[in-house]
């Protein structure tokens, strides 16, 4: 099938005006899937092979994020891991040297909350795998549904986003998020860390608010009872214990090895979530946090981190200042709250993350703090800072070569490495740009 098939061609396939015959639904489905498949193949980027030789980037300005800036620096990586970094590094004799003089080297950006890999086309339900059936799905591991062929992955890479914390949605307990690398052949290869957080959607304050909060309490109570029964069996105090995959998945939460990320924006939601988490004795992360500045002192005192979503947007309420959302990161920073900046959850808008951080830098947050909010801060909050988020010896060679600060609009991401693999920089946006630039060139020649 020609990947340039037009809408009119598609309609004529569905409906033949001569025979007045409408194609059966299952044939329509097959045709749509075929078009999506061939279109995707035309835009597919081949995943990079594992790093096979030592690579040394020389002459660039290295922004480590955690240990300052190194002018005329050298960074060496082998088998996907940084082995040397500094201004006076003795290069291995067999290293492939890449001169990046005049360029800048940054750690790959991290989007701490989005639906990339589980959302493709909003109008095509079969390409959306965000929500599971039913309200309680703690056992849903998002990486199992991750689509490594998503065209949004290449767009994310081109924007400097090399790690995506893909997050399920819907229901009361949505499932578990996962940190995914933006290159690889399959979900197993792309998973940096599974189970970065258990996702809870705090009930919306409405007529059923108290009832829904109680449902959440009861759910955690059932899961805790399950763990107690299992522990009793392990100690030999009980002979029978029926396994439940939902409650089994929540055991790491009670053992303190998995945080709970609560989607809460309004001040009442945040306050009640804080009280609930303290009662449950669990590690809490606030997601969304539109009103988090109103309880910033409490968040700071309790060391509760916040992942802010959609900084680059309008205020929540008509009476709020026009820059209420732009200035929110700066307010949290001044209050001493640990926070990260995430963009829109929509996979189609994931490339806006650098602009979200850039907007905060224009409204009260320093550029260094804004950069940290999309690198080391989300890495630390989600427990992946031993691998990504900064440029240090022993961490993954997941980095950017750029023309400037990646949160600046004018900056170009010239090349990326993910665990030492030199990734393809083509994406669907660039393909369309080249296509329509050719149209302009043809018009000029005419």
Region locations from a protein language model:
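His/Asp/Glu-enriched, well-ordered alpha-helical/loop segment
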Residues: 121-122, 127-131, 139, 259, ...
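Histidine-rich, glycine-flanked metal-binding segment
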Residues: 47-49, 53, 62, 66-106
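Boundary at the C-terminal end of the N-terminal hydrophobic targeting segment
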Residues: 42-44
